[in-house]
């Protein structure tokens, strides 16, 4: 493909909001059961559209749990074709690796690829499953070298394992009388400064959003009949960009990736870092 778009460092593409885990405080409301799987043909068409507008160094295929998508191999292959020079990353919790036995071969074939595995359970039985799955899918195949803490490399594939149950987790929203609410610190600069996902614009249903948390606000509020909630009103006014948006509008968006936005007020200004609470595991036998 030709006619590259504006250069950015990172771009996430959310191919599904379905997940086999429910992690308390998930940055994109996934723990509240939002089932959606984008059609493969739409993903390819949308990526091709956005390539003409954005030229990322790093593209992350994410969910939900992206391995739930039946065409995940093809999605990774197409992502490489379209974003030809970018690192192509897939972000997973590793529970479904046995159902995707060719994932390592696909990643080696596309090259310049990365797997990010995030562990969300302290339960030894679940941790054993994750470790076994990682060994069978990756570590047992090829020669891996430790390149940094929790990161190994084999040929042109990088595997990084993180564990938020050990710390560094915080609640992107708060619960008031059993209802999910935005934070009310009203300090978007501080919220942006302390945010863990502040430089990761994301494509969701073919719209480009500043960050993962804002991308799912309307989806969550619609499902829970909260569109009239006054506390969420400022954030419902935010709209993602379409791939045919005005060039100046997109340039403004790109510049703002590294700056706070008024929508940053929905997240805490001074988040309290903590170990992530145990994720609810769905449909996994132990």
Residue ranges with predicted function:
Residues 1-34, 236-244, 260, 270-286:
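N-terminal pre-core extensions flanking Radical SAM catalytic domains
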Residues 1-92, 97-102:
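Conserved alpha-helical substructure of the radical SAM core
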Residues 69-205, 209-210, 214:
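Conserved AdoMet/S-adenosylmethionine-binding subsite of the radical SAM
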